[in-house]
Amino acid sequence: MTVAALIVTHQSEPWLEATLSSVLAQTQIPDRIVLLDDNSTDRTLQIAEAVVDSRLEILHAATASADRTTRIAANFRQGLNACRDCEAVILGDHDDIWHPRRIEHQVSLLREHSAYMVASDGRLIDGAGELINGSLREAFPVPQAWLTAVPAARMRMALRWSIATGGASAVRPDALADVAIPDGWLHDRWWSLVATAAERMVLDPAQMIDYRVTSSQQVGLDRGLQDAGHGRRLTKAVASSFSTVKRIRALRTGLPPFATKETVAQLHGFRLLRNLS
């Protein structure tokens, strides 16, 4: 499979050299290394050019949205579209460290399962690169029943839990590059729902990155209401009913084209409000 590494950057000077060095140290070197920069004013681009040399492809963010979630999602979708000539795209945050076999491992899973998306686990590190307690899967746990669940049950789980972290994921651009991401959804959350609806989602227990936890993260380990009971979540839904209704509408209109008959039923009914609130 032809492979692209896609890194989205913004003011990435403190960490980018280590991140790109870990990409270049892979057992399977990517065919393309694409960096999409969102208006950095520090030395991000100079560092990237020095580390990667002529192999680096630099893109500039096209979105002007002031909404953080919409902006992040748009950046990754723009980057994925730029990599659509490749069969696999390995997604990366600007401050994480890739384990040496990450590309080889995730490409193998994409191929073996004909998957749209593979989401791996990761260790946690601090700003200095030191390991800290926990892992991505401990922060965003996946129900143990996932592996044996029927497709409809997996769809319910994907609606209820955030099952994929973008910086630890690999995707197929031919399946996802043309998929519009509704406002209010992050790219990794929406793509994981599309892949689950199509029964093409792989949750990988292997730790493939060191995920950096810093105060400057755009999206961190905030689980929000993921573990809250239905009562608290329904209360939250009432307080933000307009946003919730928009998200439900996005699910009902955006996912059915990808859903199998086993998963489409989960995209309708009151359970959506309960799962998304």
Annotated model-derived regions:
Residues 1-3, 24-35, 43, 55-57:
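Short loop->beta transition adjacent to catalytic acidic/histidine clusters or analogous donor-positioning motifs
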Residues 12-25:
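Short, well-formed alpha-helical segments that are part of the catalytic scaffolds
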Residues 17, 42-50, 101:
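Acidic helix N-cap motif at the loop->helix transition within catalytic regions
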Residues 37-46, 63:
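A conserved acidic beta->alpha catalytic loop
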Residues 63-84:
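Glycine-rich, basic loop-to-helix element that forms the pyrophosphate-binding segment
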Residues 86-95:
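Short beta-strand-to-loop acidic/aromatic patch adjacent to the donor-nucleotide binding site
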Residues 97, 102-134:
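Conserved donor NDP-sugar-binding/catalytic core segment of glycosyltransferases
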Residues 145-224:
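Conserved nucleotide-sugar donor-binding catalytic segment
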